[in-house]
Curated annotation (Swiss-Prot):
Alphabetized GO MF terms: ATP binding; RNA binding; tryptophan-tRNA ligase activity; tyrosine-tRNA ligase activity
Reaction(s) this enzyme catalyzes, per UniProt: tRNA(Tyr) + L-tyrosine + ATP = L-tyrosyl-tRNA(Tyr) + AMP + diphosphate + H(+)
Subcellular localization, as worded in the UniProt entry: Cytoplasm
Domain S4 RNA-binding span(s) in chain numbering: 341-405
EC number: 6.1.1.1
PANTHER family referenced in this protein's UniProt entry, alphabetically: TYROSINE--TRNA LIGASE, MITOCHONDRIAL, TYROSYL-TRNA SYNTHETASE
Gene behind the chain: tyrS
Physiological role: Catalyzes the attachment of tyrosine to tRNA(Tyr) in a two-step reaction: tyrosine is first activated by ATP to form Tyr-AMP and then transferred to the acceptor end of tRNA(Tyr).
Keywords attached to this entry: Aminoacyl-tRNA synthetase, ATP-binding, Cytoplasm, Ligase, Nucleotide-binding, Protein biosynthesis, RNA-binding
Keyword NADP annotated: no
Record-given protein name: Tyrosine--tRNA ligase
Amino acid sequence: MSNVYDILKERGYIKQLTHEEEIRELLGKEKISFYIGFDPTADSLHVGHFLQMMVMAHMQKAGHRPIALVGGGTGMIGDPTGKTDMRKMMTKEQIEHNCNCFKKQLAKIIDFSEDKAIMVNNADWLLNLNYIEFLREIGVHFSVNKMLTAECFKSRLEKGLSFLEFNYMLMQGYDFLELNRKYNCVMELGGDDQWSNILAGVDLIRRKESKSAYGMTFTLLTNSEGKKMGKTESGALWLDPEKTSPYEFYQYWRNVADADVEKCLRLITFLPMDEVRRLSSLEGAEINEAKKVLAFEVTKLIHGEEEAQKAKIAAEALFGGNAKDLGNMPTAYIDKNDLNNLLVDLLVKCEILPSKSEARRLIKQGGLYLNDEKVTDMNLVVTEEHVTEDGIMIRRGKKNFNRIVVE
């Protein structure tokens, strides 16, 4: 069996490592436990997390055990990494609900049976800590001077960094130590924005336990312009079908830029690299075939083959004019009494767009269509005349479609 390190390297996941040669040898010779942390600030994971799930799945296929750590304790503080403002604190009930949602989504590609993977909540140990003991046992190993040079704190120093958030690095380092002691977890993985926090945990274990510990970060999922992927006009691209429908999810990947196809095939599908290279080499109109494969494969992983097939059929029906298959498109249902209202109000009511200001912005940019006619009037009223045999068709941009059916 190939060393999973080589697989991760070839597919382009790895960004930084603490001990490259040691890690390669370790992953090739032993079966280890490793962990990735998830911040439970929403009740669904999104595309940014999906890349982490893929790394976990590759590692598990090679015989290593993933530990999904949900930050029920640290989530009550908030990770300052990449943030310019302090985030709202969450209740225990919110965090517990979100943890349960995460496990269902992770289980789509991670096998949790027979302890092949486990999920833990750091609230189990962080919420019961004795502050004085924590400072004496853990705090003594952290240099404030060194912490202030970490990227995750730099951007916050000018605006103000609370002592609450300053503790986050200690908490995350302690998580790694706790997992090392309980589960013999020897490696922490995370996005490259977590590098400083990961180093803190590796260093803490080496100091406290006199044992080897390792860290690895992977690239963030960005497009060819360096912007994070997974953002739509409606917000984040969620893995929960109630938040982002399988059709919208499929369409997002079907419409990625040509320059991003190869990267996405490598990072968020399990297609063999020979097939990735073949699809990525297609040019001109043929690249659309690669995009269809990408969209189908990613949707299948998250929503299952049946939903992926439905999304594919709906997309083809839309462009091929096959109305009977439009039922798989994101559809909102309204009452006749909802007619004779402003289009911008209707779009928000049907959750097609998050706000009226967003709808007006889209109209101003010339990117909103009603029954395939460009909308130019901010005060357009939707009447019975707009209701076709297939309903009211809404298009955002070139390829994002929604349907409103009047019941």
